[in-house]
Structures are given as C-alpha cells and as structure tokens.
C-alpha cells in the first residue's frame, strides 16, 4: 500500500459504533489532515472529531487502544493533548485472529484502567473497527464480566452493526469461549465492504487480507460476499438449478468470470448500461450502434466449463449450478464446450397461460478460451448463433438432447439496426413478445467492457425510469410534533438518506430491503422489491436516473433523433433539437423502418 493512501474500504465505513456495556467505544481508525486531499469533507474523521463527539455525549474517554500495525494514520499527540491515554497494541488482522497473547494483554490493560478510572470509556479501533476490535471487546466481556460468548457477540453487533463479519473470527471466539459448532454464520457484509476496485485487498501494512470462507490458494482475489438462500428466479420453480455455497468451487467460478472479463474489482463483472439522457443520446450519432428490446428479466452471466459444469452468476455474484443443460462443440457434437462465458438474462415467457423460463443470450466474452469479447459486437452475435445455439439444435435433431429434461430453454437475443427502434416499441413486434419489456437497449459495436459502461444506453419511458434504494423505516418526530414512521431511501456510496417515501402498511414489510421506486407526482412511489439484488444503486447511477426523470428523452425525441441520424448517414443534411443553438422542432412524420430480420 502506498504510504499516503487511505485504507481500502475506509471512506464510507461508519466512523464509530455505540458504547458497549458502558465501557468500550468501537470505532474505525481516524485519519489526520494529511489525507484530506483524498477524503471529501463529509467523510473525514480527524482526531478532533472524536473529541467533539465525546463532548456531545457528555462522557469522558480515558484510554484509546490502537490495534493497527502502523502509526501513519494520525498523530497520537492529537489524542494525548485531549487528556486521553494512547496505547498501541499491534494485531496482525490479515486473516489471523488476535493471538492469545494479544487477548491477554488487551484484557489486562483494560482491566487495570477500569480499576483506576471506572467511569471513563475505553476507545478501541483497528482499521475499520469491526473484526479485531469486536474480537477483543467480546473476549473482555466473557473473561472479566462473565458474559456468555453468544451475548457478547450479539451485543457488539447491536452497537457496531453488522458486528464481527469474518467467519474465522467468530469460530475462534466460540472455540475459546463456547462450542465452535454453535458459532453463528457471518452476517451479510455491509455495502462499504465492496466499494474499492483495487485488485489487492490490502490493509494498513500492505499485506493482503484473506477472504472469508475462501482458500488463500486463489491468489490475488477480492473479498466476495456469499448470499445464502439466493433465489434463482422469483415466482417460478426451476428444477435442476441449485446454489453453489461451498469452496473451492464457488471461488473458482467467481474468479474465472472475473479473469475472462478482465475485471479487477469485486462482485458481478458484467457490463452495466447507463440511463439515456439528452447528452449521451448523441453517442448514437458518433459511433455504430445496435438496438434490441429491454426485457424486464433477471441478469445472469453463464459459465460453460465442461459436461455438467454449467453455472449461472447473478448481480449479487451468487453462483448457481445448472444440471441437464448441454452445449456441444459445433465441430464435434460429442464434445462439450468449456472455458466459455456468456452474458444474458432470464425471462419468463407466457405461453398458453404457462410460465416458461428462458435464458436470452445477448453477448459472449469467451468461447472455448478464445477472447471473442475483444471482437466487434456483430461478430460476437454471429458467434452466439453459430457456436452456441446452432450446435444445440443440431444435436436435438439427432435426439441426443431431450429439451423436455432441460431446466430452461436457451435462445439468442437478436439486435437490429437502430432505425428499427420505432417498430420495436410500436409495431406488431412489441405485441408478439411473450414477456414483459420496458424499453430499449442501445449497444455499441465495440469490444465487451466489464462494469459500468457509459456508452451502453438503456432507454425507458419516463414513467418507468426507476431507482433501486435500500429502505430504512425510522421513527421521527420533533418538538410539538407526533412521532411518525418515515421511509428513508439510501443509495450506495452516500451516507445520508438520498430521498424519502411515504410509509404505508404494505411498505413496512420491506424495511432494510432493496426496493425499486419510480418518481410520480413529485414523490417516490414503491414499485416492487428487488429480491435479485442485495445492494442499492450507486449514488452516480441514482443521480443519472434522476436526471433522466427530470429532463427525459421522450419516445418522440428518441425517434426524431434516430430518424435524423439515419438521414445523415444517407448523406442528407440534418439538424435536430438536441443540437446546440437549435429550437425544438415538431416530430417528423413517421417513417417506415426496415423490416426486422
């Protein structure tokens, strides 16, 4: 780690918890003014801020125990000049729980301090104030205050949510002070744990921190969250699809997807579109694009890695194994594809009143280890048809693939010239699609890019533009006012509430859940729970959607722009209302788009 760099995941980690057992205050490390150039004012945590917080509580802290392995984060003199004794107790923390010697030293110095200064708090911090900090505080509660380990862990989690989140720390506590078989599973990781895109998970001394529940043999891998009980497809039972929760297979699949995409961050590596607005719509005139309908489906990447080794990866980076789904090699139908990564979405078609799950493939990143993701998008579409779809159909003709035994069907999703956009939305095509569609996707013809892609544009009718929030229902009131429930809406990477929503009887069940909301009549309105997502939209994404809501590209504007782009490509002069120095022009008469082929 660079000597002047802020610790990974520190920025939006909460500064402090609540006092534990009236004796301890858990907090993250403070950063001195030397780091201000890297930290926005609202995210700073100077030593002086700790002093101001203690004064607001009208409590005195007499001792601060620093568990980190460095002295670079802040000047201890800034602590000591406030009358707080400072002690450095180095704990490794990189995949290692505090040793017995660390624990004995911590308990001894805290006990001695409490005997001499019983009313004063002891502050404890590691880098983030959760695992090493929680471990040692819990050990003290058990050894010196006769608490059960269950009560100690639960109390710390209430004071510093979500508590100790490393499974090996919890197991070690229960091994020392209880029954290791009764150790609880680690809680869901908080959003701030997934915010850095560095490829190395370094802590304060530059060492790599191991991942919970994973093998160190995977090398330079980011910490990946495990969501137990993930649902594959909401509202439909799909036989033959089971979640992968055990190592090493889980980590191997996640790592392979990351490597194939060239993704150095954590979490889902797939390309993510942005909302179309009056600025980025101009990209349609600057580079070649294809268009397809936007299905209201569930995003999945598919890793094909040999016979009975087909896996689906969702936006939470959860992994599912798919049985009885075969992808033969075109040149030899007896062989099975491997080292192949697809991108697409699961949709539910309604056929004769029955729900039929299908996987629509709309991109390919690797084909039998070949980096086809670097090819032109048109080439990739041909690859999907020729190498993925056609060989399956050929083998079905021989009777060697029984489609009725497959958990879901597989199809390729076609893309068209952008001049067909009107027909996709308004023609018979829209009526013939047997699943929900809520807009259009405009795909540039360049190579595949993982993560947020500012040139992949999604257009939705203004009435359907939405944001995925985390809902937190809070009881609020004021002087002369009756307390009432308020729905606070949070987005990723932003500590304060982004917006509010009226709390109804229906909404109460979604407290602390991810909900999709639209903006209607000057207020946010609940649409549905997003069971396929564990995190809200990022702040920048939410702001982009809000911009498209307040300043939307209407269907008429979109059609006009595309018509004029088409005219320009045919050598005709064009001028449209989104160009600078032009006035709003009425929509041109409808043109008959080229047939969809």
UniProtKB/Swiss-Prot annotation:
Which ranges carry the Tyrosine-protein phosphatase domain?
Answer: 25-183
Single GO cellular component annotation?
Answer: nucleus
Q: What does the record say mutating residue 294 to A does? A: Loss of GTase activity
Give one GO biological process term.
Answer: RNA processing
Tissue distribution is: Isoform 1 and isoform 4 (at a lesser extent) are expressed in cerebrum, cerebellum, thyroid, lung, heart, liver, kidney, spleen, large intestine, testis, skin and muscle.
Active site per database record: 126 (phosphocysteine intermediate), 294 (n6-gmp-lysine intermediate)
Keyword Plastid assigned: no
Q: What does the similarity note say?
A: In the N-terminal section; belongs to the non-receptor class of the protein-tyrosine phosphatase family. In the C-terminal section; belongs to the eukaryotic GTase family.
The protein's name is mRNA-capping enzyme
This protein's encoding gene: RNGTT
């Amino acid at each position: 780690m660079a000597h002047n760099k802020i610790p990974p995941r520190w920025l939006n980690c909460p500064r402090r918890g609540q006092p534990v057992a009236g004796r301890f205050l858990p907090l993250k490390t403070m950063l001195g003014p030397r780091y201000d150039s890297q930290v926005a004012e609202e995210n700073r945590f100077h030593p002086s801020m700790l002093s101001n917080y203690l004064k607001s509580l009208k409590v005195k802290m007499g001792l601060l125990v620093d568990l980190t392995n460095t002295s670079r984060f802040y000047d201890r003199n800034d602590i000591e000049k406030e009358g707080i004794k400072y002690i450095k107790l180095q704990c490794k923390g990189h995949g290692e729980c505090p040793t017995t010697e660390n624990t004995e030293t911590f308990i001894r110095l805290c006990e001695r301090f409490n005997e001499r200064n019983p009313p004063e708090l002891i502050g404890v911090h590691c880098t983030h104030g959760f695992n090493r900090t929680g471990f040692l505080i819990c050990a003290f509660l058990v050894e010196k205050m006769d608490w059960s380990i269950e009560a100690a862990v639960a109390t710390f989690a209430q004071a510093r949510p979500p508590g100790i989140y490393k499974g090996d720390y919890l197991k070690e506590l229960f091994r020392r002070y209880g029954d290791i078989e009764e150790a609880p599973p680690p809680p869901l990781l908080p959003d701030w744990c997934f915010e850095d895109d560095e490829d190395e998970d370094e802590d304060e001394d530059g060492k790599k921190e191991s991942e919970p529940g994973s093998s160190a043999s995977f090398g330079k891998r980011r910490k990946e969250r495990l969501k137990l009980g993930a649902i594959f497809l909401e509202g439909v039972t799909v036989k033959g699809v089971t979640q992968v929760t055990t190592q090493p297979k889980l980590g191997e699949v996640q790592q392979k997807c990351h490597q194939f995409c060239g993704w150095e961050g954590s979490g889902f590596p797939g390309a993510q579109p942005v909302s179309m607005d009056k600025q980025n719509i101009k990209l349609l005139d600057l580079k070649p694009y294809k268009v397809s309908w936007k299905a209201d489906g569930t995003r999945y990447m598919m890793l094909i890695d040999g016979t009975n080794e087909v896996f689906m990866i969702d936006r939470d980076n959860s992994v599912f194994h798919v049985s009885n789904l075969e992808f033969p090699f075109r040149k030899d139908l007896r062989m099975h594809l491997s080292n192949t990564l697809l991108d697409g979405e699961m949709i539910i078609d309604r056929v004769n009143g029955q729900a039929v799950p299908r996987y629509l493939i709309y991109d390919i990143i690797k084909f039998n280890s070949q980096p086809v993701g670097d090819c032109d998008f048109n080439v990739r579409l041909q690859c999907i048809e020729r190498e993925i779809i056609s060989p399956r159909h050929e083998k079905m003709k021989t009777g060697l693939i029984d489609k009725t035994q497959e958990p879901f069907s597989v199809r390729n999703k076609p893309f068209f010239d952008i001049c067909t956009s009107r027909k996709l939305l308004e023609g018979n095509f829209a009526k013939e699609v047997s699943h929900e569609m809520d807009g259009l996707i405009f795909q540039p013809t360049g190579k595949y890019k993982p993560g947020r892609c500012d040139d992949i544009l999604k257009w939705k009718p203004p009435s359907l533009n939405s944001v995925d929030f985390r809902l937190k229902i809070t009881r609020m009131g004021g002087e002369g006012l009756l307390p009432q429930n308020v729905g606070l809406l949070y987005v990723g990477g932003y500590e304060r509430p982004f917006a509010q929503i009226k709390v109804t009887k229906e909404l109460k069940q979604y407290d602390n859940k991810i909900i999709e909301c639209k903006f209607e009549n000057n207020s946010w309105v609940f649409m549905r729970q997003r069971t396929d997502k564990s995190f809200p939209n990022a702040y920048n994404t939410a702001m982009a959607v809000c911009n498209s809501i307040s300043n939307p590209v209407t269907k008429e504007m979109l059609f006009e722009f595309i018509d004029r782009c088409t005219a320009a490509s045919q050598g005709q002069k064009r001028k449209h209302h989104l160009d600078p120095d032009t006035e709003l022009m009425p929509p041109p008469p409808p043109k008959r788009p080229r047939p969809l082929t």
